[in-house]
From Swiss-Prot:
It comes from Neosartorya fischeri (strain ATCC 1020 / DSM 3700 / CBS 544.65 / FGSC A1164 / JCM 1740 / NRRL 181 / WB 181) (Aspergillus fischerianus). This is Probable E3 ubiquitin ligase complex SCF subunit sconB. Residues 1-12, 19-29, 295-306 have a biased composition (Basic and acidic residues). Gene3D superfamilies: 1.20.1280.50, YVTN repeat-like/Quinoprotein amine dehydrogenase. InterPro entries: F-box-like_dom_sf (IPR036047), F-box_dom (IPR001810), G-protein_beta_WD-40_rep (IPR020472), Quinoprotein_ADH-like_sf (IPR011047), SCF_subunit_WD-repeat (IPR051075), WD40/YVTN_repeat-like_dom_sf (IPR015943), WD40_repeat_CS (IPR019775), WD40_rpt (IPR001680). Pathway: Protein modification; protein ubiquitination. Residues 276-291 have a biased composition (Polar residues). The keyword Repeat applies.
Length: 689
């Protein structure tokens, strides 16, 4: 036996062997490893001399591959057969050895592989087209090698792999590396439970989610599910996302709240088989209006009921079971898509403009809801418009002087005039229901919330009207016209802005002033409480590169009024900062307010501390009109310009021009805003399309 054969049988090649010798030994190693390797895996076996005892024994012949091949085939069969019979008895057990009872496969060989689909076992079919090109004897050898590896336990597999790779040359190792790079990739969303998959997907942004939906049908079912997109809507709609900085227009809060419990249930009971096919464009779904669509649950009787998704209006009888929490709704992904489109239009100023003309004098107040717009003018009339068509629906006449303020809801419209009166109208019919006379001067500001109406007047007072018990009260403290009032029924407080350059916060229970805000050096025209969802971080005050607005450091903090039993030094919580009346669980007033004045500035205040957090500079003349939500502030001024501001950074994002007179009033919605001017026109900017 020569040195090369000894090296092959021992499984150790010489370090000085040529590539040709390595490749020659490679073919032999592929067919059957050395005896020592077999002994290490399958235990001691008979020698070649014990097997071949006939006259054609190879003891006197050279140990070439051709003479060794029949010997190795018999040796492989004798050594491999018991191993395969032990691990795969249903395929390799001798005939007659089975008793008719099904033989269970070893649990070690029946485990599912985490890398492949859970319904497929680790063993895979051979590459049949490639195998057909080989000789039958080679096919048998390769099949034996695959069978051994497939039947081997995990620790044996590692040992076999180590032995194979130890005999591989660099081209083969390179092939292994390239192949493993693809095989090592796992479909983790398929392997994981749905609730964990949803948790992972909720960390992705919208771009990554859309890419994930293109991987496979199952990934699309998971990535497009309402569980993921409802979370995305909660994170971005009506607020600024802290991660990406994006904020989308307002969606009906009630819909988000009603859907949250359903979404949580669906995440725990999700089944890909329940996901419907892609909805046709003409399927009957409840569309989303400009302010967002609503969801009304048809059944909510059991807290532990299973949730089943139903996107179309055709509900089969079996799906009307009370055990299911059913809703018909528009998918949250489509809702997010529409809101994202509107948000992008806001960001880049893409909008359509509709102009409403009809008043004969300057427009002083306006409000719009859905497709209804109401405007009040110095011509002593109120006009109702259809915002979709631009048509004037009706004109409300009754006041004897200019209309300075108005507000409407589904049932009524209340207006205030310089004729010292307030009127309640049925705006759908144009009928004047009642007239209230309580001020000694013109009514220039009003606001109602629930059953409380507040009005501000030229007579320097704020009057509170209670619709429920028909009571009224007068709040005195301002020394000049009261231009604007805002009621917060939850905390039972009222804000008022006056020409005396101050803003006051009133307690409706004690009929007293809680706090006065000082800082403006011009007549304060508007005060707007920000929604409670608005969040303002301290580091936002110290924003760098703020070329438009600066923090007001020279204005004094708001001064709390003298309240018996109230110590400002010991009041460190937001509730106690407003006095002892707010210590018993009573809701606090809105945390932030914005004000505008004829000093050409807008200010953002923290009500609990009275600090002016930011002053917005940009208008050239006095700011008459102001509106705000959680995403933006809109202002109109004597300089005929309308500006859009970011309340967190103070940056002026965009300026709109077009009016030929001072901008006196503004209405703000999630996808549009309207401005009124002394030029007798109303301009509505829509970002929906």
């Amino acid at each position: 036996m020569d040195a090369h054969e000894l090296s092959f049988r021992d499984g150790h090649g010489s370090s000085t062997s040529t590539m040709k010798d390595e490749c020659a030994s490679e073919e032999k190693a592929l067919y059957l490893p050395g005896d020592s390797s077999f002994a290490s895996v399958f235990g001691p076996s008979e020698t070649v001399e014990d097997v071949e005892t006939g006259p054609e024994s190879t003891q006197d012949k050279p140990h070439s591959f051709n003479t060794q091949k029949p010997i190795r085939e018999k040796l492989a069969g004798k050594n491999v057969a018991p191993f395969l019979a032990r691990h795969i008895p249903e395929q390799y057990a001798p005939l007659g050895s089975q008793t008719g009872q099904p033989v269970e496969i070893s649990s070690a060989n029946s485990k599912y592989c985490y890398r492949h689909r859970p319904d497929l076992k680790c063993r895979r079919q051979a590459d049949e087209p490639t195998m057909d090109k080989l000789q039958r004897s080679d096919q048998q050898g390769i099949a034996h090698a695959w069978s051994i590896f497939s039947a081997a336990p995990a620790k044996h597999r590692k040992l076999i792999l180590q032995g194979i790779m130890a005999q591989c040359c660099f081209p083969q190792l390179s092939f292994i590396s390239a192949t493993v790079r693809d095989l090592i990739r796992i479909d983790f969303l398929t392997a994981l439970p749905p609730e964990i998959s949803f948790k992972i997907l909720c960390y992705l942004d919208t771009t990554s989610l859309c890419k994930a939906a293109q991987v496979s049908r199952r990934w699309r079912a998971l990535a497009d599910d309402d569980v993921v997109w409802h979370r995305m809507c909660e994170q971005h709609i009506h607020r600024k996302c802290k991660k990406c900085g994006w904020g989308l227009p307002l969606l009906d809060r009630k819909r988000l709240r009603e859907s949250k419990r359903e979404i949580e249930r669906r995440a725990a009971t999700w089944d890909v088989s329940e996901q419907p096919a892609e909805t046709e464009s003409n399927s009957a779904t409840i569309d989303t209006a400009a302010s967002g669509s609503k969801r009304k649950p048809e059944s909510d009787k059991e807290d532990t009921a299973m949730v089943k998704r139903q996107c179309t209006s055709i509900v089969s009888q079996s799906e009307q079971n009370e055990d299911y929490f059913k809703t018909r709704y528009r998918p949250w992904k489509e809702v997010y898509k529409d809101r994202f489109k509107v948000g992008t239009n806001w960001k880049y100023g893409r909008c359509s403009i509709r102009v409403f003309k009809g008043h004969s004098n300057g427009i002083m107040c306006l409000q719009f809801e859905d497709n209804i717009l109401a405007t009040g003018s110095y011509d002593a009339t109120i006009k109702i418009w259809d915002t979709e068509t631009g048509e004037e629906l009706r004109t409300l006449k009754g006041h004897r002087s200019g209309i300075r303020c108005l507000q409407f809801d589904d049932t009524k419209l209340i207006s205030g005039s310089m004729d010292h009166t307030l009127k309640v109208w049925n705006w759908r019919t144009g009928e004047c229901i009642s007239t209230y006379s309580g001020h000694r001067g013109g009514v220039v500001g009003l606001h109602f919330d629930a059953t409380i109406l507040a009005s501000g007047s030229v007579d320097k007072t704020v009057k509170i009207w209670n619709f429920e018990d028909k009571s009224t009260c007068l709040l005195r403290g301002h020394t000049d016209w009261v231009n604007a009032v805002r009621v917060d029924s939850a905390s039972r407080t009222v804000f008022s802005a006056s020409d005396d350059c101050t803003v006051k916060l009133w307690d409706l229970d004690t009929k007293s002033c809680i706090r006065t805000f000082h800082g403006h050096v011009g007549q304060v025209q508007q005060v707007v409480p920000l929604p409670r969802e608005f969040e303002f971080e301290d580091h936002d005050v110290e924003c760098e590169n703020d070329n438009v607005s600066v923090t007001s450091g020279d204005s004094p903090a708001a001064s709390p009024q003298a309240i018996p039993g109230f110590d400002a030094q010991t009041s460190d919580t937001p509730s106690s900062a407003f006095g002892p009346a707010f210590d018993d669980g009573r809701p606090s007033p809105p945390r932030y307010i914005v004000t505008s004045a004829l000093d050409s500035t807008i200010r953002l205040w923290e009500t609990s501390s009275g600090r002016c957090l930011r002053t917005f500079f940009g208008h050239l003349e006095g700011v008459w009109a102001l509106a705000a939500d959680t995403l933006r502030i809109v202002s109109g001024a004597e300089d005929r310009m309308v500006k859009i501001w970011d309340p967190r950074t103070g940056k002026c994002e965009r300026t709109f021009t077009g009016h030929s007179g001072p901008v006196t009033c503004i209405g703000l919605g999630d996808s549009r805003f309207a401005t009124g001017s002394e030029d007798c026109e109303v301009r509505m900017y829509s970002f929906q399309t």
